[in-house]
A protein has these predicted regions:
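Nucleotidyltransferase catalytic core that binds NTPs
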Residues: 1-166
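The conserved Walker
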Residues: 175
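Conserved substrate/cofactor phosphate-moiety recognition/catalytic segment
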Residues: 188-230
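Glycine-rich phosphate-binding loop used to anchor ATP phosphates in small-molecule kinases
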Residues: 220-285
Length: 360
């Protein structure tokens, strides 16, 4: 006997898994059918089309020999969203052609109406986890509830879908403004993943100072910072929020500030032809929900690694303006909140913002 489960999986969650796991336990093989329409609102809300969702569901069940994942594009089948008997007949006939072992199919479903619809087109089905007395599923979760408030239902979301639903916070500023301490303190307070400044880690590991840097090093900064971002998102301990200490715009800020400085090994051509295109390419893969920009205001701390020629308030203000312009150039200014208070005030602002995320 072959079990069939189906859904849009926008995202895959425990309610779906209740159905899939029962089918897997009661049949010889379970087919999970990822279905949906092109340009449908639920997929667009999630930011994942049917091909991407199919890949993510496959990733989740990777290594499970009792489950096979296939996709059905309802738009390509010419179906509308009426759930008519004719649509069901077309859809089930197509699904049957996709399953080689299709002589004895049984559908496992989570909605009562599906059992009636499938019966009309000649298929048996088993309703899983539905409470008729209450008129809802026993595990009362839905993809629409998750899309509306992912953090509330975080533990019920399948892992591959979590990075795309994570709230991502970025802290930016010039050197010696308390970014690293702020990010680390917030990370400890909420026990959320954080990223450090890759460029600084790279330079400390290589025993380099700013005048030792070439364009290849700045390129490494851009790629390394992106890797840090991905690692934080994919952290299994990610509880739905991550916070980052700087991103690629800070690398561009320093590179641009060093142009024309005879102590530095970077040219206008390096910046415009190599660094900016690379940063823009990586930027297309990154998103931020909130950006905090710290204004220059503190005493510059010489920790033995910072470039002291840029320690004056005048130079730091110039770098700050470069950063502001980059945020605007990259279309991020609308997400920016400027911080211009004390260390504790900054901490409280971020703490309150994250608390609000979890309380919605």
């Amino acid at each position: 006997m072959i079990g069939v489960c189906f859904g849009g999986y926008c995202p895959l969650h425990q309610g779906h898994l209740d159905v899939i796991m029962r089918a897997k336990k009661e049949t010889d093989l379970c087919y999970v059918v990822v279905c949906g329409y092109e340009s449908e609102p639920r997929g667009e809300d999630l930011g994942k089309d049917i091909k991407q969702r199919t890949q993510m569901v496959r990733e989740f069940f990777r290594g499970d020999n009792l489950i096979k994942v296939i996709s059905v594009n309802d738009t390509e089948l010419g179906l509308d969203e009426s759930m008519s008997e004719n649509n069901w007949r077309i859809w089930t006939s197509y699904v049957k052609t996709r399953i080689p072992e299709s002589d004895d199919l049984i559908f496992y479903v989570g909605e009562p109406r599906y059992t009636e619809d499938l019966k009309k087109v000649g298929y048996n089905s088993i309703l899983v986890g539905y409470d008729y007395f209450r008129g809802c599923r026993v595990n009362d979760i839905s993809a629409s509830k998750i899309r509306e408030n992912p953090l509330r239902w975080w533990r019920k979301i399948a892992y591959p879908f979590k990075p795309g639903l994570t709230k991502k916070i970025l802290v930016l500023g010039t050197a010696s403004e308390g970014k690293t301490t702020l990010v680390q303190d917030i990370s400890k307070y909420f026990q959320i993943p954080c990223t450090t400044e890759f460029g600084r880690d790279y330079m400390e590991k290589s025993c380099m100072l700013d005048p030792d840097l070439y364009v290849k090093d700045f390129s490494e900064f851009l790629l390394g910072q992106y890797r840090y971002y991905c690692e934080a998102l994919e952290d299994r301990g990610n509880p739905g929020v991550i916070i980052s200490d700087t991103d690629n715009l800070v690398t561009l800020m320093y590179a641009k500030a060093y142009l024309g400085n005879p102590e530095m090994n970077i040219t206008e051509e390096d910046y415009e032809n190599i660094l900016v295109p690379l940063a823009k390419s990586l930027h297309s893969l990154i998103s931020w929900d909130k950006i905090y920009l710290i204004k220059p205001h503190n005493i510059f701390v010489d920790d033995g690694t910072r470039y002291m020629a840029q320690s004056s308030m005048s130079e730091r203000n110039k770098n700050y303006e470069i950063l502001v312009n980059l945020l605007k150039e990259f279309g991020l200014w609308g997400k920016v909140e400027i911080l211009n208070g004390t260390y504790f005030e900054h901490f409280e602002i971020l703490k309150n913002y994250i608390n609000e995320l979890y309380q919605v």
